[in-house]
Amino acid sequence: MVSKLWKNYDATSAYDGYFTEDNKLRKHATIISSILERHGKKKLQEIEKNCQSTISSRGINFRVYAANNRAEEKKWPLDIIPRIIPKTQWNKVSKGLKQRVTALNLFIDDVYNQKKIFKDNVIPKEIIFKSPYYVKECEGFSPKYKAWSNISGVDLIRNKSGEYLVLEDNLRVPSGVSYMLENRMVMRDVFPELFTRYKVAEIHQYTNKLYNCMVECIPKKKANPHMVVLTPGIYLSLIHI
């Protein structure tokens, strides 16, 4: 039976993370549904207001550019009602993403070195060599572990049957990682009940893992390596001040 909170909700137009096509609540959404129902519209509006206030006070913005190249800063949008991915689903997606990024790194390494992909006629070489992003100076070079892409931003979508599909791969230093970390901190502050009722996967070790990844990719081992992250700072389309 669908509660009053959802009685006018239509979940048939596309895949819905909370409801099946026949408007039955999915198992992993029962807890969040009861939380939302208990709080009611007024309380949820208070949480939303608190969320926006926290975002403003923390200076979480993003920059958009108009047709005249004039930049405008906007507040970062954050939905207080989360997308819930069950652990079994995420484990499968995570495994697939690791496999995909490994394949992409091997592809890049092959393009700059053995070029088997052209010899086997998998892809026309003109597509690669005419690309403005092809760096001829990298020919014959292979980074440690063949890790050309240290950070990969893979955009995922779900089709109507719930299958995960890749919309695009962002390998050229994708932005947005700090937003992920800030989203989590803001949500813990404004909606802590979600984290007591669900066993949410932790992400606070991300920066340490990124550092360790960069250290591992240094060609020669050093006790205290110096690493530099190049960034245009506030001139990025996404900024976090």
For the regions a language model picked out, list residue spans one by one.
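Preference for protein termini
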Residues: 1-239
